[in-house]
């Protein structure tokens, strides 16, 4: 039993990451960013984790937050979207001294009423650099703002406005110090983890924090489910920081390919049989 738990622990451990290689890769990525024509202030660093199979459990693919050691957001115009009682939450924002950060509070009914056209939704999107969403209505945001948010890769942060253990102010502070994490429906998962303006040490700490959170909370089988891990910017090539054993990876990809194969339809089976019988006659 002890061996099993030790194996599980190893599957979640960061010991597999070569820290010296990671430091070297971070330096290489930052050098690439500085040599490009783009302003360094606008470049962001992402961690990309490729798994052998999609993470099937739906609860693990819900939007979540990862608290980072080094802040990556500087927000001055946040919008808070709540289920209802817009004025109540507007008053709460002012009472807790959040009105310098949260400049607009919208209820879902108000959002539906006031922002109907694509143009109106784009104006709302472009007026704010962060969207905080009541976790009770987070599932409605893709329906109401989907394509408009997707165009600019806007990812709303879930927040529990009914939380009694933690004030709204503290929750907002945690959001500002966090990154957005949502596993994709496929096998490639990309998470923002740093800024090009941060130091190598800050990026290292943020990257390892995100990776540890993924292994512990979102990828049940840990390293055994991961094909490779890399870091990148939005436009750069992925720079690998860990790759699974080549033979094992090839074997697992083969298994996944077989599992994902679509069963043949009856018409396709009949056509296949006709083809086989035709070949047999020809050979005679």
Swiss-Prot record:
Transmembrane segments: none annotated. GO terms for cellular component: nucleolus; nucleus. InterPro entries: Ribosomal_uL1-like (IPR023674), Ribosomal_uL1/biogenesis (IPR028364), Ribosomal_uL1_3-a/b-sand (IPR016095). GO terms for molecular function: RNA binding. It is found in: Nucleus, Nucleolus. Residues 264-284 are annotated as: Disordered. Pfam families: Ribosomal_L1. It comes from the Eukaryota. The keyword S-adenosyl-L-methionine does not apply. GO terms for biological process: ribosomal large subunit biogenesis; rRNA processing. Keywords: Nucleus, Ribosome biogenesis, rRNA processing. Involved in rRNA-processing and ribosome biosynthesis. Component of the 90S pre-ribosomes. Belongs to the universal ribosomal protein uL1 family. Highly divergent. This is Putative ribosome biogenesis protein C306.07c. It comes from Schizosaccharomyces pombe (strain 972 / ATCC 24843) (Fission yeast). The lineage of its organism: Eukaryota, Fungi, Dikarya, Ascomycota, Taphrinomycotina.
């Amino acid at each position: 039993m002890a061996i099993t738990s030790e194996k599980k622990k190893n599957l979640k451990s960061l010991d597999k990451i070569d820290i010296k290689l990671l430091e070297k890769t971070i330096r290489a990525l930052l050098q690439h960013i500085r040599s490009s024509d783009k302003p360094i202030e606008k470049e962001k660093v992402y961690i990309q984790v490729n798994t052998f199979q999609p993470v099937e459990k739906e609860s693990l693919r819900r939007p979540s937050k990862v608290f980072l050691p080094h802040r990556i957001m500087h927000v001055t115009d946040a919008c808070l979207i709540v289920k209802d009682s817009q004025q109540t939450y507007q008053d709460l924002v002012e009472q807790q001294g959040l009105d310098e950060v949260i400049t607009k509070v919208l209820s879902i009914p108000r959002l539906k009423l006031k922002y109907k056209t694509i143009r109106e939704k784009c104006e709302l999107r472009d007026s704010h650099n962060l969207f905080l969403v009541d976790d009770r209505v987070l599932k409605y945001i893709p329906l109401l703002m989907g394509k408009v948010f997707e165009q600019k890769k806007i990812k709303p942060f879930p927040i529990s406005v009914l939380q009694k253990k933690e004030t709204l102010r503290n929750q907002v502070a945690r959001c500002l110090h966090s990154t957005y994490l949502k596993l994709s429906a496929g096998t490639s998962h990309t998470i923002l983890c740093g800024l090009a303006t941060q130091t190598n040490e800050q990026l290292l700490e943020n990257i390892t924090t995100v990776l540890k959170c993924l292994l512990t909370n979102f990828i049940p089988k840990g390293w055994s489910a991961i094909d490779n891990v890399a870091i990148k910017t939005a436009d750069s090539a992925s720079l690998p920081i860990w790759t699974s054993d080549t033979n094992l990876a090839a074997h697992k990809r083969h298994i996944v390919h077989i599992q994902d194969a679509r069963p043949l339809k009856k018409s396709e089976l009949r056509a296949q049989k006709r083809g086989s019988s035709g070949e047999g006659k020809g050979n005679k």
